[in-house]
Swiss-Prot record:
The lineage of its organism: Eukaryota, Metazoa, Ecdysozoa, Nematoda, Chromadorea. Interacts with the flavoprotein subunit within the SDH catalytic dimer. One of its GO terms (cellular component) is mitochondrion. It comes from Caenorhabditis briggsae. Plays an essential role in the assembly of succinate dehydrogenase (SDH), an enzyme complex (also referred to as respiratory complex II) that is a component of both the tricarboxylic acid (TCA) cycle and the mitochondrial electron transport chain, and which couples the oxidation of succinate to fumarate with the reduction of ubiquinone (coenzyme Q) to ubiquinol. Required for flavinylation (covalent attachment of FAD) of the flavoprotein subunit of the SDH catalytic dimer. The keyword Plastid does not apply. This is Succinate dehydrogenase assembly factor 2, mitochondrial. This protein may be expected to contain an N-terminal transit peptide but none has been predicted. Keywords: Chaperone, Mitochondrion.
Amino acid sequence: MTTLLGPITRRFLSATQIARSLTRAEVPGEQLDAKRARLLYQSKKRGILENDILLGNFAEENLKKMSEPELKAYDKLINGEHMEWDLFYYLSNKKTPPEDVEKCSVYQKVKKFVDEKRVPRS
């Protein structure tokens, strides 16, 4: 039985390791263009449609203009310790973000972008 599960486990771990490398907050030695491309992809493929739209639209309009430190902060924001729904709730004023998030200049840019795109309710 263990010989049968060995290859399956190895394949699963390999897929997990690949997925983890695609979503971690920093990739050592990553070129700036590659970082922008990765962040654009990760902004559009969040796992929940709401964040796909909010972060994907922000990324399309802003990543090319962002400096390396801003890209690093954006990477940490979207791929860091915050759950997807929490990030959505912070951006949609449903929850107050933690102090470190609220003070982050990149979060403030994303928040401003989201607030400006918000459709007024009647």
